[in-house]
Amino acid sequence: MALHAAVKGKLISVIGDEDTCVGFLLGGIGEINKNRHPNFMVVDKNTPVSEIEECFKRFVKRDDIDIILINQNVAELVRHVIDAHTAPVPSVLEIPSKDHPYDASKDSILRRAKGMFNPEDLVR
């Protein structure tokens, strides 16, 4: 019988408005790594775009994060950085916020995924 080492789970990170972050934190996703860096960032109207970019890049570099959730309206501010991220992990998912509904036409990840498939291949 082989012994299997326990694999430490990976994290979900969140970049979004206060309501989004609080909701996910209440759901239990909040973590602080050994360097005392949290896996979430609360963005408000006064948050500089450069700070959002740096946070996104930091989350991408962390090996303990597998999914980055980002409010779509925040993603629009750093679209060039998100579009430059082409690796499958961490996956980037754009989510709606309370004040901004989801718009599939603005989701670059969804557009990229649609480009991978030919619609005729999906029809039987």
Curated annotation (Swiss-Prot):
Keywords: Hydrogen ion transport, Ion transport, Transport. One of its GO terms (molecular function) is proton-transporting ATPase activity, rotational mechanism. One of its GO terms (cellular component) is proton-transporting V-type ATPase, V1 domain. InterPro entries: ATPase_V1-cplx_f_g_su (IPR008218), ATPase_V1-cplx_fsu_euk (IPR005772), ATPase_V1_fsu_sf (IPR036906). The keyword DNA repair does not apply. Belongs to the V-ATPase F subunit family. This is V-type proton ATPase subunit F. The lineage of its organism: Eukaryota, Metazoa, Ecdysozoa, Arthropoda, Hexapoda. The gene is VHA14.
